[in-house]
């Protein structure tokens, strides 16, 4: 690491889930400490779209949180200072669409990623095929 370069850490789903669910409280407190460190500028937390997808799915399926609430909570968390989201535009659009529409986060992310490259989507999923600008088969 060169002088003046801030350290970066890749964020794992476990920290997101603990912070958003407060389950269990002692791990939620540790997670909050990690996020505070990023907010204070001690380091940057990088978030991969796969981590967002796993978080969305787990909050919906295991914790039974309504999709709109999941979308809003994840967006608020990702908007915090010190957070760097990879493929940010596609992630945010997918959160919005998955929170309000009929597509899963992964399908919405795939669709928005394909559009960003002016590509199509190869799928047998009817909902995704209808959403995609171009598709196969």
Language-model features, listed with the residues they occupy:
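Hydrophobic helix-cap positions at the C-terminus of alpha-helices
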Residues: 37-38, 77, 97, 113
């Amino acid at each position: 690491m060169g002088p003046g370069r801030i350290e970066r850490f890749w964020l794992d789903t476990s920290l997101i889930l603990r912070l958003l669910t407060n389950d269990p409280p002692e791990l939620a407190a540790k997670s909050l400490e990690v996020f505070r460190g990023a907010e204070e500028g001690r380091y940057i937390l990088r978030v991969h779209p796969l981590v967002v997808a796993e978080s969305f799915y787990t909050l919906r399926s295991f914790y039974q949180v309504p999709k709109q609430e999941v979308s809003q909570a994840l967006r608020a968390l990702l908007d915090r200072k010190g957070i760097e989201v990879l493929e940010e535009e596609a992630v945010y659009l997918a959160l919005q669409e998955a929170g309000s529409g009929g597509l899963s986060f992964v399908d919405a992310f795939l669709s928005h990623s394909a559009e960003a490259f002016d590509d199509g989507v190869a799928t047998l999923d009817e909902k995704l095929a209808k959403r995609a600008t171009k598709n196969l088969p």
